[in-house]
Design a protein with these regions (language model features):
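Juxtamembrane segments at transmembrane-helix boundaries
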Residues: 40-44, 59-136, 148-162, 173-194
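Alpha-helical transmembrane segments of multi-pass integral membrane proteins
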Residues: 22-29, 77-92, 136-147, 217-219, ...
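Soluble, non-transmembrane domains of integral membrane proteins
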Residues: 200-318
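Membrane-anchoring hydrophobic segments
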Residues: 1-88
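Membrane-interfacial segments at transmembrane helix termini in multi-pass membrane proteins
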Residues: 182-212
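Intrinsically disordered, low-complexity terminal tails and inter-domain linkers enriched
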Residues: 160-172, 202-209
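Polytopic alpha-helical membrane-helix bundles and their juxtamembrane interface segments
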Residues: 164, 174, 235-238
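Alpha-solenoid helical-repeat scaffolds
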Residues: 53, 109, 129-132, 211-215, ...
Length: 318
């Protein structure tokens, strides 16, 4: 819960905040499930399975929230995310209200869809600096999802969830929870201690960073683009790069956005295209972030490409 809250603070000003809220909700649900099991408030294996399915449904919401994180529809998209969570948890609701005492009847398609969504969430960040964190979270999610994976025996849904503290299911649950928490905390610590872009912060304001950024595409576009890549993952940043590069090619700008940052070519003394390129790049970025966020993640003024190898060439683009 702490890591999810920290993620929400770090993502403020972006459309990734709802994903952090969903992650916090999933953490609360898992804490409630764990508390009920520890206090002995729930004894029925079917009730354990229903609670776990609700936790799993909520844990998949952050990935879906990120896939729709573009303004202006990102707010309405949360209703779709909530509907998905309800549909995934429907077998638990049905078993509890309609057939009390029976195991949730999870359809085979849902058993395949849930781990597929976990893999999609991992792939979205696999090529970013948060790749190791995403891998830890994905493995932990699969362990928590284990009773509802394809080909899982129905007995495994009730047995491990209701067994003793040293049972195979309890150990798997504990390991899964630890991996998810570790991955989330690692991502939060990495974002604070090792940001993708040296933040301009007070130094940038003191030296007129806003004015410098107007003349420097590396500061105005490359820096925020890399920071957004670490926040939203590959899906949207590659789309931003594709749109920017299409406009750049049409208008003859000697620059291209790659997954590793902004590549600039041509005559270094020719700045006639800078203002238009910055305006176009910022327009694309504003679909996901606020102006204040853009200012916070611009590179410090006069920071050369040689001092920022991750923004300058090169790397493979889309």
């Amino acid at each position: 819960m702490i890591a999810a809250g920290a993620g929400g603070l770090l993502a403020r000003g972006t459309t990734a905040v709802p994903a952090a809220v969903w992650a916090w909700a999933a953490a609360v649900a898992f804490a409630v499930e764990t508390g009920c099991r520890a206090a002995g408030l729930v004894h029925d294996p079917a009730a354990f399975a229903a609670l776990r399915l609700v936790v799993v449904a909520l844990s998949l919401c952050p990935t879906m929230a990120l896939l729709g994180a573009k303004r202006p529809q990102h707010g309405v998209w949360q209703f779709i995310v909530g509907s998905l969570a309800f549909v995934l948890a429907m077998p638990a609701v049905s078993a509890t209200l309609v057939r009390p005492g029976t195991m949730p009847d999870v359809h085979a398609l849902q058993r395949w869809f849930m781990p597929l969504l976990v893999v999609v969430g991992w792939m979205n960040f696999a090529a970013t600096r948060h790749g190791p964190s995403a891998a830890l979270v994905a493995i932990g999610q699969l362990l928590l999802l284990r009773p509802f994976l394809p080909f899982a025996a129905e007995a495994a849904v009730g047995g491990p969830l209701s067994a003793g503290p040293m049972s195979e299911g309890s150990i798997s649950d504990g390991l899964g929870a630890v991996l998810v928490a570790l991955g989330a905390m690692l991502a939060a610590v990495q974002s604070v201690a090792w940001p993708a872009v040296p933040r301009a912060g007070l130094q940038g304001r003191a030296f007129g960073n806003d004015r410098a950024a107007v003349a420097d595409p590396l500061a105005a576009i490359g820096g925020p683009f890399l920071a957004l890549r670490e926040t939203l993952g590959a899906a949207w940043t590659l789309r931003i790069a594709e749109r920017f590069n299409a406009v750049a090619e049409t208008r003859g700008w000697p620059c291209r956005l790659r997954f590793t940052g902004l590549e600039m070519g041509g005559d270094p003394h020719d700045t006639s295209w800078h203002r238009d390129a910055i305006r176009g790049g910022r327009a694309l970025l504003r679909r996901f972030v606020s102006d204040d966020w853009l200012r916070r993640h611009e590179r410090p003024p006069r920071l050369s490409a040689e001092k920022c190898p991750e923004v300058a060439p090169a790397g493979e683009g889309r």
